Amino acid sequence: MIAPPATTLPVIATLTASVLIAAAALAWYRPRSVVDHPLLVLAVPLLLSLLSMAALVDPAGPSLRMRLDPSEEPMLAPDDPGLAPYHRATANFGDDNVYVVAVETAEVFNTEFLLAMQTASNRLRRLKGVRNVDSLVTTTHYGYDNDIDTVLVRRLIDRVPEDLDAMAALRERALSDRVYPRSIVSADGRTAALNISFASMSDGDFVQSGLDESIRAIAIEEFPAPASVYVTGRQHVKTRAHHIMVGDLSWLIPLAMTVGAFVGWLVTGSLRAGFIPVGASVLATLWVFATLAALGRPLNMITLVLGPVLICVGAVYGIHILARYEALVDEGMNARDAALGSLKDTAAPTLMAGATTVAGFASLAGSDIPATQELGLLAATGVAWATVSSLCSIPALLSLLPPRGSRRQTSVGLRANALLRRLLDLIAGLCTRRPLPILAAWALVAVVSAGLLPRIVVDTDYLTFFDPASKVRTDFAAVGRLLTGASPVYVALHGGREGAFREPGTLRALERLQAEVDRVPGVRATTTIVDFIAPLNRAMERGDPSAERVPDSKAGVAELMFMLPRNRVRGLVNSNHSSANLLVRSSATGSAAVRQLEDDLKVAITRAGLPAGMEANVTGNTILLNHGADSLARTQTTIVAFAALAIFVLMARFFRSAGAGLLAMIPNLVPVLVFFGLLGAGVAMLSLATSLLGCVALGMAVDDTAHFLVGYKRRRARGMQAEAAVSDCIATLGKPIVVTSIMLSSGFLVLLLSGFAAFRQLGALAATTMMICLFADLTLLPALLLRFRR
């Protein structure tokens, strides 16, 4: 199926929101219809679920119609001005995919090792999908043969030497070459590389081909211990990411469902509280995934968290409805009346909580990163579905179920409730007696957190998704340490006319630039067309060392260009020689290091003094992905501010008071400020994963605040004093607030079992932030209400 453009997603979100607003209006204005016609109400989500299953499941497999996209492309800003030079460079010189198998041993230049290298190279070249393998035994060498007085263009190793003198001569020839020590053998002769290029294929086709597994298996078989084999490159990393994505998708969602239901049962002692709210959120998640499948949109490295997040976020709405239902049953109401009463009492705060959470997620659409935009829109749609599913389906179902008898709870639930009541009584007493010290303590926390904000480190490196101890990270580091690194950067030069890089003056300017770039910190190796022209010119001049340079005439350059094998220089000069590439190999990782590398390369271009009319661009996938860090830093404040403004407007409209709206925002802004303070304290970096949490936490935190404020206003309207109203709200609403917070935290903690380190960080930070929100709602909000006597 061909995926529609990303602009389809806002359209789908708008249409979905329209349907949900209509359904919400039913719950708000005609609540009696929900319990009067429960079977009809329940038939709607059942029908939607059946349609969703039809969209999700391919019966021919049977298999899911869900695609996974482990690439970096969804994390690249589409309006990045660096995209055009990158596409131009890859059109001229091919893509910057580098796949390296590095083998570390005691000595590369021995007969046994080189024979194994020869066998491995031949086996790899025979794999379907492999275009070329460049290694010591396959690479081309240019030299002058005195005996026959001719220039030889042949393989560096035609036949693996067996005597020591021939092997020593080979070692000297290879390590003194301008190119080999930079790409296929280390300068100390202890590590050799097989650089593999592939036929054109999509990331999905590459994963399905099994090439990554086959290559590693061949390498390990041909180079057994004590040799060490390291594999790295974009295709390898994306393959490992795909496998982790499959694992996360297959069990994090069921685990989130199980944990949510278990926590609900454990805290309340009620199976209904465990399964019904989670069931409503699972339905909403199913509908969102079906929308993705119907659109042909893949899950990427960011939207992968959609399932677990929606399940834990969507379940909280049902908890409040069930808590109110149980309270009304305790007062003697029958099931139908209790269901109707719970719907009437919770509709307003639930709709408000849903709207603010939708606003929090939707604000992610303001990001420059497509993956973040997509997650925001899909999650906002899912939360809207979960809100209405909870408001309509749960009361309809409860009206059909008999109320539980007097022995309604397990012994675990009874003990948990007793402990929770004592804790809430303690908090209520503290808030009513000491509101000012509570406010002072929270003010101190906010000031300290604000002071840590300038220390936040932004990092969007793709490798940070993986654990530092993973093979992906350790192999990447090993290749960077032993050879030249697997992060290629292009310095693409455009001469402005055909044949520009057949001119000696232009090539000498390229040589000057290469010398400047070689001095840049972090650059491990550089390669240009001059590295092939100069040795070949020396060979043409009977091996004269002084002739290892660019020829003086254009005709001389043209002759050498004609002799060079096209497959050796296709990445260094385009077909009509109007453009050339300075290939930079660096082991720089992390946004700060890559940004510094880019800046230093631009300075080197300026120092080189290129001829008038020549254009030079620093580009590459590594550079573009790093631009996401700048975008993230630039837009993070704007996104969170927009979310806060949208939520404030919703709260002010709901309570019909700007003051009440502002009061409601304070206990929700402070936890978000603390979250960013934790980033500034070095707990984690602001990455593509952790950047999701700021505005999302703001939207979710308002849920419990809305329920508390609605309850408080109703009690004040009945004539209660502020202290009594606060105490009663903590005693009666505290339980569902605690349950929902624990359920949210537990749901996010499920991400600790993800195969991606970035998501484990997100899970831990989200769970911590949710607990901070809980303490803010139970202490800071009551203290504010008592201080300002709202």
Which role does the model predict for each range below?
Residues 1-46, 340, 388-446, 464, ...:
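Interfacial helix-loop-helix hairpins and adjacent transmembrane helices
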Residues 41, 56-107, 114, 161-185, ...:
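Solvent-exposed, non-transmembrane loop/terminal regulatory segments of multi-pass membrane proteins
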Residues 246-287, 355-363, 634-670, 674, ...:
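Internal alpha-helical transmembrane segments of multipass membrane proteins
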Residues 115, 160-270, 282, 508-511, ...:
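Extracytoplasmic
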Residues 273-321, 658-710, 776:
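Hydrophobic transmembrane alpha-helices and their membrane-interface caps
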Residues 309-330, 350-357, 392-393, 696-715, ...:
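Short helical (or helix-break) motifs at transmembrane helix termini and adjacent helical loops
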